[in-house]
């Protein structure tokens, strides 16, 4: 399998990643909107290439608690994907999916099993939308694993894909 360094990736690669992101996020927004029964406003995805060591600080405070949905991909492409949500968005999405209304959440309120399952499904749909866009645009077969979910500090959650990246080299 071909591996590239950041120095070898040119503007064309970044444009391709942006286009895949546009298609994938559009499909994901439509799927999630249908699930929650409300319109989803999406921003145009941004693509930034950076060393893994800088990833934590790029997404926000490393000690902030976030929700991470992680899965591995295999077949024509081997790798992993992670979808991150802040706690407020996670509670909002879980409440919408489970049809809970007017719920006030404490800042560090723990998610119950049903809420975690609903959020895992959202992450599964979003990552599958991106993978589907990538597969259809490249004619590659890409198989996702069952997703895993974790609620922890951003630095702890991001250490999982970073460790996998360094052990696969």
Question: What spans do the regions from the language model cover?
Answer:
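Short, extreme N-terminal leader segments that mark the start of a protein/domain
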Residues: 1-35
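Polyanion-binding surfaces on beta-sheet-dominated domains and ring/shell assemblies
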Residues: 4-15, 57, 111, 133, ...
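Beta-rich nucleic-acid/ligand-interaction surfaces
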Residues: 43-56, 144-161
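Ordered, amphipathic secondary-structure segments that act as subunit-interaction surfaces
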Residues: 72-114
């Amino acid at each position: 399998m071909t591996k590239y360094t950041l120095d070898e990736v040119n503007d064309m690669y970044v444009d391709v990643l942006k286009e895949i992101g546009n298609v994938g996020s559009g499909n994901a927004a439509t799927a999630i909107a249908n699930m929650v029964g409300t319109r989803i406003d999406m921003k145009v995805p941004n693509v930034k290439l950076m060393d893994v060591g800088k990833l934590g600080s790029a997404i926000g405070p490393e000690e902030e608690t976030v929700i991470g949905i992680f899965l591995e991909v295999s077949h024509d492409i081997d790798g992993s994907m992670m979808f991150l949500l802040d706690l407020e968005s996670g509670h909002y999405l879980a409440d919408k999916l489970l049809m809970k209304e007017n719920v006030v959440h404490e800042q560090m309120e723990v998610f119950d099993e049903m809420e975690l399952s609903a959020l895992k499904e959202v992450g599964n749909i979003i990552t599958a939308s991106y993978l589907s866009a990538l597969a259809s645009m490249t004619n590659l077969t890409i198989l996702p694993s069952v997703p895993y979910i974790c609620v922890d500090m951003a630095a702890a959650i991001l250490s999982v894909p970073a460790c996998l990246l360094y052990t696969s080299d």
